[in-house]
Regions:
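Short, well-ordered alpha-helical segments
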Residues: 1-28, 90, 95, 102-142
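Hydrophobic, ordered structural segments
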Residues: 4-58
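Short, conserved loop-to-beta-strand elements that form functional interface hotspots
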Residues: 23-35, 136-148, 170-177
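Intrinsic disorder/low-complexity detector
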Residues: 39-110, 161-184
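C-terminal functional regions that serve as terminal interaction/effector modules
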Residues: 132-135, 140-147, 153-171, 184
């Protein structure tokens, strides 16, 4: 599953590099399970490429690659004006399999598995951001699902954008951007 996700993101980055982009905003990773293909999953990565008008090297990752971010264009610009740039769209999950129990009481092993799955998924996402030389993760979304694949399973999925600080003395937005809706 991780190899398929990484391949989809790599292909999107390669296309952005071919276009001369500095990064990708609004990136989303769609995971589809097509009928007739059993347990196979299809990963599709889409996003909007952006390029700096000035020297865009500060917008690229420390490794010189195109950055990826699931932030909207507006959120990206706010982040940029605050002195940060995205590094990488981070995505981690963890699935804990459990034995079925037929009692109508709290299932301590299920409760503990839920806590463990969440903590492991978050730790993996943080480690992925650190490997990309980021200082934090913004726009984090955590989803939890329970499924039955022969056994009962609890799964946590964590998504976000890792960021790094750029120029310390860059101008920071003093007020939010306002668009006049009454203009003709």
């Amino acid at each position: 599953m991780y190899n398929a996700r990484e391949l989809a993101m790599f292909r999107m980055q390669a296309e952005a590099d071919a276009l001369g982009a500095d990064g990708i905003v609004g990136a989303r990773l769609e995971i589809q399970q097509n009928e007739g293909y059993g347990d196979l999953l299809d990963f599709v990565a889409v996003g909007t490429v952006v390029r700096a008008r000035e020297n865009g090297t500060a917008w690229r990752t420390p490794a010189g690659r195109t950055f990826t971010s699931d932030l909207s264009g507006q959120d990206f610009w706010k982040l940029r004006k605050a002195g940060y740039v995205p590094v990488q769209f981070v995505h981690q999950s963890f699935r804990q399999m459990l034995r079925q129990q037929g009692q109508n009481v709290e299932l301590p092993n299920f409760t503990q598995a839920t806590y463990d799955a969440r903590e492991i998924a978050m730790a993996r996402m943080q480690a992925e951001a650190e490997r990309a030389q980021a200082i934090g993760v913004v726009g984090v979304r955590v989803t939890e699902s329970t499924r039955v694949w022969g056994q009962h399973a609890v799964e946590f999925l964590c998504l976000g954008t890792s960021v790094r600080r750029v120029e310390e003395n860059e101008h920071v937005i003093a007020s939010p951007m306002v668009i006049n809706l009454d203009a003709t």
